[in-house]
Amino acid sequence: MNSFPWLTIFVGLPISAGFLIFVFPHRGNKVIRWYTIFICVLELLLMTYAFSYYFQLDDPLIQLTESYKWINFFDFYWRLGIDGLSLGPILLTGFITTLATLAARPITRDSRLFHFLMLAMYSGQIGLFSSQNLLLFFIMWELELIPVYLLLAMWGGKQRLYSATKFILYTAGSSVFLLMGALGIAFYASNEPTFNFETSANQSYPVTLEILFYIGFLIAFAVKSPIIPLHTWLPDTHGEAHYSTCMLLAGILLKMGAYGLVRINMELLSHAHSIFSSWLIIVGAIQIIYAASTSSGQKNLKKRIAYSSVSHMGFTIIGIYSISDMGLNGAILQIISHGFIGAALFFLSGTSYDRIRLVYLDEMGGMATLMPKIFMMFSILSLASLALPGMSGFFAELVVFFGIITAKKFFLMPKILITFVTAVGTILTPIYLLSMLRQMFYGYKLFNATNSYFFDSGPRELFVSIAILLPVISIGIYPDFVFSLSVDKVEAILSNYFYS
């Protein structure tokens, strides 16, 4: 048990600081923006300090644990803790949220509410990744919905209300299954419900009941990850959201679903996970092909990037359901890698829109001459997205491939077939990404756009782009940094699978 409540501070600081925005007199949008950035940076520095000094990388057990009695009526505890599985997503959350807040500079309407919602999302994300209680996990899961809905509905594009409504219907509807699964596990074979992850992990269930629990959690996490065919909210949401919101969606929100698949489905319901693994690997392979093919046909820039996110999450799904050491480590690396790359691509698409006011690729062209810095950053990060060697995505996808091949659960021919289909998906990736670069930056100049918007990337845009690019290159050169966080925890999870 940790003597100092680090995790409670990390969860409570952003939203508490957000409430202060409404308490203090309004001093202008600039003051609010820098105050929010200061809170995000302070949170990130505190997390880095605490994890550097108090987290032991070689310990697979839950660390920095905190447990406080919250509701006496049904023995509900505020229980937090982190391990190698949650450490990476927490640091990713702090990093991306800080940069997304800096990227939100053009926001001037209802600035106080906007920045409060950003900080509220920050608290919810940290709370979810550090939760060690099923009900607390659900509360933090739900805490995300209202801020994202308002960010979409109030600061989105022309179809923002449609996209926001579609988002809330999908995510809130799927959350019902998450709650049902949590209550089912808590009340099973006990008059006094327990939501504790550790207790639930040691519980055994009848096969039929475990499958029902598993399906409930799977639906909730499949919507958020997303997994086809429950992905259709994502392109519309990304297509209409402000690019700072897109950074949070692509960088963190999608990772919550993948994290839930490992933390709950894989760790708590191992037998059902084994039963569903063959089917979900097939779904993951189809998702890579389908989303990559669909992305090539998208004329809207942000929707093309959104479908590329769906395709890349297919590798995460395959890694999780390979039930192998290399596959699961590759999936975790893909979660981190795509968090950076997806956020960067949406940021660059948004800064491009700020200048040319165009969203359709067939209306663009010739931007390389007009905006060479944006062209350079867009090109480098697009190459990172297609898994160029030396970038983080290369090792993530390569290790997932190795995970499929070395998986002991599957026969040789199915493994070869899945590997082949997945490899075809990696061939489609450069097709839609390089086509996107060609349509945007080469060809004829933008005669139908106002010349006043033709200014290149400024210091803010360059700082955000380079800040994201550096960890992408660093992980690509030295992926062991991420593997060192997760390898012991992955080994502990797979110890529940006799063929791992």
UniProtKB/Swiss-Prot annotation:
One GO molecular-function annotation for this sequence? ubiquinone binding
Q: Where are the transmembrane segments?
A: 4-24, 35-55, 84-104, 113-133, 134-154, 167-187, 211-231, 242-262, 272-292, 305-325, 330-350, 386-406, 416-436, 463-483
Alphabetically ordered keywords of this record: Chloroplast, Membrane, NAD, NADP, Plastid, Plastoquinone, Quinone, Thylakoid, Translocase, Transmembrane, Transmembrane helix
Stated EC number for the protein is: 7.1.1.-
Predominant subcellular localization, coarse grouping? plastid
Q: Where in the cell is it found?
A: Plastid, Chloroplast thylakoid membrane
Organism domain of life: Eukaryota
Q: What cystine linkages occur within this chain?
A: none
Give GO terms for biological process.
ATP synthesis coupled electron transport; electron transport coupled proton transport
Coiled coil ranges (UniProt) are none
**Catalyzed chemical reaction(s):** a plastoquinone + NADH + (n+1) H(+)(in) = a plastoquinol + NAD(+) + n H(+)(out); a plastoquinone + NADPH + (n+1) H(+)(in) = a plastoquinol + NADP(+) + n H(+)(out)
InterPro entries, sorted? NADH_Q_OxRdtase_chain4 (IPR022997), NADH_Q_OxRdtase_chainM/4 (IPR010227), NADH_UbQ_OxRdtase (IPR003918), ND/Mrp_TM (IPR001750)
- Pfam families named among the record's database cross-references: Proton_antipo_M
Per the record, membrane topology reads: Multi-pass membrane protein
What's one GO-annotated cellular component? chloroplast thylakoid membrane
Q: Supply the PANTHER family for this chain.
A: NAD(P)H-QUINONE OXIDOREDUCTASE CHAIN 4, CHLOROPLASTIC, NADH-UBIQUINONE OXIDOREDUCTASE CHAIN 4
Q: Which family does it belong to?
A: Belongs to the complex I subunit 4 family.
What is the name listed in the Swiss-Prot or TrEMBL entry for this protein? NAD(P)H-quinone oxidoreductase chain 4, chloroplastic
Species in which this protein is naturally found: Populus alba (White poplar)
State the gene name recorded for this protein. ndhD
